[in-house]
């Protein structure tokens, strides 16, 4: 049985009873937790404030919306997930959840997340949440991911919108502050994802997903990571210069950014194995979390 037949036959396997854990995994909990955290930062950094109960509802809606997008992404990508070592244990691939069941679950969650955001919070945040879900599923997952080398650059906008949604849920508007939060994640996403693609290159090549290392090679990808790392360093300092944060943020963000640059330079000159790419990938996760944590604690 070849790879294509194996992936097509996923829809014909006998499925065991699904568990709560399977549905949690279907929602990509690691991604969802980062989405909720950055969404909270957007709420915290907004000039106004919400009633605590409404704030919790907004965060739940953001979480459910992110989970719905993750579930539909797994439904659509089940064929290539079956071919990649990194994703072969996902619920649909290993037969824990049926494909149609996953799609229904994702669509229902998407509807309720947007509906309750509009009903309980405000229309703008609901509209932004709907756009984010649509963008991630239709623009990134169904179109760009398998067709463009710039898939993660353009598609990364979806992952950068949660703080904008959080900000809008409190203020009812989109401002320069929320755009800067968007830009930090938007510029962070390509180097983070390309580092992953460097040490998962064989998987992406096998699935014919046009990630940059597959199409342009490792050296070109490392150059792009370095360029984006410089842009990220500059962008991460913007909150101080527009009055969002204090001098403590500026100093620590600069140090974190310099370390990010150090890892990207080390990666560029590394010709051995994938260890440096894995180190860079791990640090990039820590970096984004700590930058937003700093913004929360150092807001003006």
Curated annotation (Swiss-Prot):
Keywords for the protein's UniProt record, in alphabetical order: Cell inner membrane, Cell membrane, Heme biosynthesis, Membrane, Transferase, Transmembrane, Transmembrane helix
Biological role: Converts heme B (protoheme IX) to heme O by substitution of the vinyl group on carbon 2 of heme B porphyrin ring with a hydroxyethyl farnesyl side group.
Pathway entry: Porphyrin-containing compound metabolism; heme O biosynthesis; heme O from protoheme: step 1/1
Source species, domain of life: Bacteria
Gene Ontology cellular-component annotations: plasma membrane
Membrane topology: Multi-pass membrane protein
A Pfam family matched in the record: UbiA
Principal location listed in the UniProt entry: membrane
Transmembrane annotation, as ranges: 31-51, 52-72, 92-112, 123-145, 152-172, 179-199, 225-245, 247-267, 280-300
EC nos: 2.5.1.141
Chain's gene name: ctaB
Organism listed in the record: Rickettsia bellii (strain OSU 85-389)
Protein name: Protoheme IX farnesyltransferase
Catalytic reaction equation(s): heme b + (2E,6E)-farnesyl diphosphate + H2O = Fe(II)-heme o + diphosphate
């Amino acid at each position: 049985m070849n790879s294509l037949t194996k992936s097509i036959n996923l829809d014909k396997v006998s499925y065991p009873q699904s568990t709560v854990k399977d549905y949690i995994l279907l929602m990509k909990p690691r991604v969802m937790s980062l989405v909720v955290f950055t969404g909270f930062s957007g709420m915290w950094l907004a000039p106004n404030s919400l009633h605590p109960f409404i704030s919790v509802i907004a965060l739940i809606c953001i979480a459910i919306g992110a989970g719905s997008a993750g579930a539909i992404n797994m439904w659509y990508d089940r064929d290539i997930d079956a071919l990649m070592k990194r994703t072969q244990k996902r619920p649909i691939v290993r037969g824990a959840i049926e494909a149609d069941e996953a799609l229904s679950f994702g669509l229902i969650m998407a509807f309720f997340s947007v509906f309750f955001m509009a009903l309980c919070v405000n229309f703008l945040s609901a509209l932004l949440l709907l756009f984010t879900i649509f963008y991630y599923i239709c623009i990134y997952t169904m179109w760009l991911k398998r067709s463009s080398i710039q898939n993660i650059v353009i598609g990364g906008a979806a992952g950068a919108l949660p703080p904008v949604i959080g900000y809008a849920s409190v203020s009812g508007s989109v401002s320069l502050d929320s755009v800067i939060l968007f830009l930090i994640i938007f510029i962070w996403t390509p180097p983070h994802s390309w580092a992953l693609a460097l040490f998962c290159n064989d998987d992406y090549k096998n699935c014919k997903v046009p990630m940059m290392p597959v199409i342009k090679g490792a050296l070109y990808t490392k150059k792009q990571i370095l360029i984006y790392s410089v842009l990220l360093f500059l962008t991460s300092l913007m909150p101080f210069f527009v009055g969002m944060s204090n001098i403590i943020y500026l100093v620590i963000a600069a140090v974190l950014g310099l370390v990010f640059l150090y890892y990207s330079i080390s990666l560029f000159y590394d010709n051995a194995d994938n260890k440096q790419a894995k180190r860079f990938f791990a640090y990039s996760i820590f970096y984004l979390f700590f930058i937003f944590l700093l913004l929360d604690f150092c807001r003006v």
